[in-house]
Amino acid sequence: MPHTHSRHGSSGDDLCSTDEVKIFKDEGDREDEKISSENLLVEEKSSLIDLTESEEKGHKISRPDHSPVFNKLDTHAPSFNMGYLVSPYSYANGSPSGLPVTMANKIGLPPFFCHNADPLSTPPPAHCGIPPYQLDPKMGLTRPALYPFAGGQYPYPMLSSDMSQVASWHTPSVYSASSFRTPYPSSLPINTTLASDFPFRFSPSLLPSVHATSHHVINAHSAIVGVSSKQECGVQDPTTNNRYPRNLEAKHTSNAQSNESKETTNDKKKPHIKKPLNAFMLYMKEMRAKVVAECTLKESAAINQILGRRWHELSREEQSKYYEKARQERQLHMELYPGWSARDNYGYVSKKKKRKKDRSTTDSGGNNMKKCRARFGLDQQSQWCKPCRRKKKCIRYMEALNGNGPAEDGSCFDEHGSQLSDDDEDDYDDDKLGGSCGSADETNKIEDEDSESLNQSMPSPGCLSGLSSLQSPSTTMSLASPLNMNANSATNVIFPASSNALLIVGADQPTAQQRPTLVSTSGSSSGSTSSISTTPNTSSTVSPVTCMTGPCLGSSQERAMMLGNRFSHLGMGLSPPVVSTSTSKSEPFFKPHPTVCNNPIFALPSIGNCSLNISSMPNTSRNPIGANPRDINNPLSINQLTKRREYKNVELIEASESKTIVAHAATSIIQHVAVNGYHANHSLLNSNLGHLHHQLNNRTENPNRSEQTMLSVSNHSVNSSECHKESDSQAIVSSNPPNAGSSDNGVISVS
């Protein structure tokens, strides 16, 4: 590909014209490069002969008068009188320019002349009194550096004696800054050459320098023209010019290193001891040559197969010979190498030990950045952090990235950065699987979902059946929470009134060790159906809410208020009655109270053998579609949206006799037991009902008591009132007058 090179204008425009374009061509430099590398030895020998001849001629040549040519330089002098090297106008078509005829004949160049048409018959002297360069191997100059370029980059294979003489004339003072004082500004950068730079500056392409700075210094016309376009087109790294000696040095060093490595490997292979041959190997060694001679096969695998077949065809007597030989081989081997073991030939064990050592050393440093899977492996998942077990982000890795140490207190972080303790991580698992914060206590889950208690499996938050949020640790307190109970264990009995009015009757028990039982019944507007849920107030089945240690003032009113707040959204609808219990042992519906005389209203006798078991009752509640069945606080459950009913407003109930209300409540309980198929003694229930009526007649004889009995009906809340306690252990019925806005659901609070 032809390269065009435009001449650069210099400060002295009168020296030459600046409109000339030189075109150079690259011709087959790759092929000639191989030839030149083969001819290097011949060229080096001939160059030594030429150098000796040029030294002799250099001493004979006289110095002309214009020795101070660099200090008193004529402005029209071409190229600082360096035209003896190359004319600034070397034409591509071979037009005449100035070199001496003798020199041109020797190197095959057409004679050329300088600008003033004065042929340089005699070369200039060694400048500034410095003797000519002696290109001798003793000077430390490497001889291959005379030919740094490939043979294809210049058409002439080697320097003649005269051109070698030209190379010997120029000393480093040629390029000194003091030599170019007059015609060029001092700001022009000038390179001074060293002895190591000199050989490649005078290359066979006749370039004094390939560097751009000295390139401008030597010639005002942008370059002393060379044949290679690669030399013209940019600054070349000196390492490329010196590539022959440096490559040789690199080869020597690489060869030395390879030899050393081979020696070390040989040293390692020397102690390798082969294990003794067994019987079959001895047979193969003996018979292999015969099989190869008989068969034309050359593959060793096929030969081994043939030998194996023949070995199995041998009789025991023939094989025993080889077994005897193998035994002798082993004995000889043991005598030669007493401490030898076959494990020495296999480096797996040593490699394994090495890996373990490397791991132990890197554990202190780089292994902290690894995740638990990479650090401990799949076999030790117990040591993984909790997020790694869930295939989440490793907290140890994240803490190592953040510069913090690994969490040592056993706590970990979830995806959102909230810290989880070890106690909360199981709950965290359940919440991630679909549980909610409003669901029941998940630590004591019942495995059979059909036998789950009503506290855990109620689908609708708006259902009256079963008091759907008995154990929900939500903002509104549940009935079964210890916060809602007095310190003295009181039995709370909830009866449904005829129009969704709830009556809370509290009876003080003499012994605080008895477990309080909560019986909750709820019925529809007709009062025909109701559901019963007995929940023992134990620490394992109730929500972990802070328990009240002492009896508080107005505790019954607070219970009523919480109950009213809990069922403030009962206008949504009712689900089918569900009977559930959280206890499997038989407990009476109502505990017998021995102190009947101290009971303010009544004490219900126990109903015998009435244990309620969930397994005997059909689970009529269905799980809502698209919502978690345990999520009782979900306002968009299916039952709530599809079973919306309009309830009749409950008017204010003013009953002067509590006998009828309690009787209706007891009747509804018996009715509910009969409808749902409880195996209870109905005659016992009837007798208990008669006993209840008798007690009510005795209690309602006092007119003062009956006048003070009032029913408080509220829609969304029951106002708190003070709890009056008398010294004779008889509780006084306290109630508040109803609010003007109370309409829907009534709650009767009696303590």
Curated annotation (Swiss-Prot):
Residues 54-66 have a biased composition (Basic and acidic residues). Disruption phenotype: Flies exhibit a segment polarity phenotype and altered expression of the wg target genes en and Ubx. Residues 1-53 are annotated as: Beta-catenin binding site. Residues 699-721, 729-751 have a biased composition (Polar residues). Residues 46-70, 233-273, 349-371, 406-477, 514-545, 695-751 are annotated as: Disordered. A motif (Nuclear localization signal) lies at residues 351-357. Residues 421-430 have a biased composition (Acidic residues). Belongs to the TCF/LEF family. This is Protein pangolin, isoforms A/H/I/S. It comes from Drosophila melanogaster.
